[in-house]
């Protein structure tokens, strides 16, 4: 069973619908005490980093998600959910994250991007795998995923980087370390390729 963390922010219904499409048993969970009952967990999210962390703390989900990660079961962050896995973000100030991955979240650097690039990045972009992973099983190199974001991750450990994309310059588009992984793009909005990623996640372990 896949648990989708409900902390009053995020694209919960679209993630649930995508999981149902790939044949997974899944449900939205708002009770922190129940997270460990699930085989795997998805942390979705849209909006501002600081607000999201505040919701996680107030709902009691922060400690529950950290406990789940320690259990060794698969945990997947999507979009803002991926960003929350890192140590901190510089979105509208400086905010501490969950600290499950080493690195930080920064805004796209307009001085490096050149002309013609709008922020947020919104639309399809190519994904370049940086290492092998069960999450990418059955996918050919250079596939496209759907992105909506103004900030991106900078990982301290190169070996944690699962994939990169280019928007003016290369940035981390997916991360994976042990049982914790994240995608900056939205698999649930990325048609067959995105559904394959979610299916792969459901088959890990």
Curated annotation (Swiss-Prot):
Record keywords, A-Z: Amino-acid biosynthesis, Cytoplasm, Glutamine amidotransferase, Histidine biosynthesis, Hydrolase, Lyase
InterPro entries: Class_I_gatase-like, GATASE, Imidazole-glycPsynth_HisH
Keyword Hydrolase attributed: yes
The EC number(s) this enzyme carries: 4.3.2.10, 3.5.1.2
Single GO term (MF): glutaminase activity
Pathway(s) per entry: Amino-acid biosynthesis; L-histidine biosynthesis; L-histidine from 5-phospho-alpha-D-ribose 1-diphosphate: step 5/9
Keyword field contains Lyase: yes
Entry's Gene Ontology BP terms: L-histidine biosynthetic process
Entry's transmembrane regions: none
Reaction(s) catalysed by this chain's protein: 5-[(5-phospho-1-deoxy-D-ribulos-1-ylimino)methylamino]-1-(5-phospho-beta-D-ribosyl)imidazole-4-carboxamide + L-glutamine = D-erythro-1-(imidazol-4-yl)glycerol 3-phosphate + 5-amino-1-(5-phospho-beta-D-ribosyl)imidazole-4-carboxamide + L-glutamate + H(+); L-glutamine + H2O = L-glutamate + NH4(+)
GO CC annotation, single: cytoplasm
Residue ranges occupied by any Glutamine amidotransferase type-1 domain in the UniProt entry: 1-205
Record: active site: 79, 186, 188
Subunit organization: Heterodimer of HisH and HisF.
Name this protein carries in UniProt: Imidazole glycerol phosphate synthase subunit HisH
Organism of derivation: Wolinella succinogenes (strain ATCC 29543 / DSM 1740 / CCUG 13145 / JCM 31913 / LMG 7466 / NCTC 11488 / FDC 602W) (Vibrio succinogenes)
């Amino acid at each position: 069973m896949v648990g989708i963390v409900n902390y009053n922010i995020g694209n919960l219904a679209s993630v649930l619908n995508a999981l149902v499409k790939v044949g997974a048993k899944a449900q939205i969970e708002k009770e922190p005490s129940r997270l460990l009952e699930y085989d795997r967990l998805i942390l979705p999210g849209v909006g501002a980093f600081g607000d999201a962390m505040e919701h996680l703390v107030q709902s009691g989900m922060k400690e529950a998600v950290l406990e789940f990660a320690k259990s060794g079961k698969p945990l997947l962050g999507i979009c803002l959910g991926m960003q929350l896995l890192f140590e901190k973000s510089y979105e509208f100030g400086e905010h501490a994250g969950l600290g499950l991955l080493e690195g930080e979240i920064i805004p796209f650097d307009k001085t490096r991007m050149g002309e013609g690039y709008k922020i947020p990045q919104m639309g399809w972009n190519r994904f370049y795998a940086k290492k092998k992973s069960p999450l990418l099983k059955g996918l050919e190199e250079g596939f496209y995923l759907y992105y909506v974001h103004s900030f991106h991750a900078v990982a301290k450990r190169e070996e944690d980087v699962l994939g990169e994309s280019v928007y003016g310059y290369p940035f981390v588009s997916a991360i994976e370390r042990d049982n914790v992984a994240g995608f900056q793009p939205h698999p649930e909005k990325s048609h067959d390729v995105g559904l394959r990623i979610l299916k792969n996640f459901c088959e890990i372990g």
